[in-house]
Swiss-Prot record:
Catalyzes the reversible adenylation of nicotinate mononucleotide (NaMN) to nicotinic acid adenine dinucleotide (NaAD). This is Probable nicotinate-nucleotide adenylyltransferase. It comes from Ruegeria pomeroyi (strain ATCC 700808 / DSM 15171 / DSS-3). Transmembrane segments: none annotated. It catalyses: nicotinate beta-D-ribonucleotide + ATP + H(+) = deamido-NAD(+) + diphosphate. Keywords: ATP-binding, NAD, Nucleotide-binding, Nucleotidyltransferase, Pyridine nucleotide biosynthesis, Transferase.
Amino acid sequence: MRQGFPYARPGQVIGLFGGSFDPPHAGHVHVTREALKMFGLDRVWWLVTPGNPLKAHGPAPLDRRMEAARAMMRHPRVDVTDIEAHLGTRVTADTIAALRRIYPRVRFVWLMGADNLAQLHRWKDWRQIIETVPVGVLARPGDRISARMSPAARAYAPYRIDGQARHLLGRAEAPAWCFVNVPMVDVSSTRIRAAGGWSAAQQGRGQTGTQDQ
């Protein structure tokens, strides 16, 4: 396996959880743990991005975010990675395509919050994402209606897997997606930065009981 890339066995189901993690926080941990349980995943890879093309201002340096993410997300079935920096990709569709070439016998599931589903139609090649890998959507209370009524949700409504069958998502053939409600930790990276940078986030270092997107 290439240096900087996690190991995966053929046939494994890997959840891909991408984001700037600027900073990582207990909400990210909570979502990751819920995704592992709900979607029948063997592992989850955090994809700490070099930058987010939908954000006007760049995040903190990648090495700082990687260090903080590894301190925050401690779980034997979760890998914190900077895969996109090694691949040179900047958009999700390209990252997924590259990973499928590198790991041809691994099954990937893209994980996202309902807030991201609501704006998925703005992502470059967003249809390619849904038609390439199953998508698991984890919703907190305030994001549910806008996500369910989003252009992406309406366009792919026939391919939605019922929440009661969510554990089958990892073995489904794309296009397939599943929308589940999860109790959320009331924290966000945006609010942490607005409250004074990363100092508040560092108070949660080492927590493993919760996670979010």
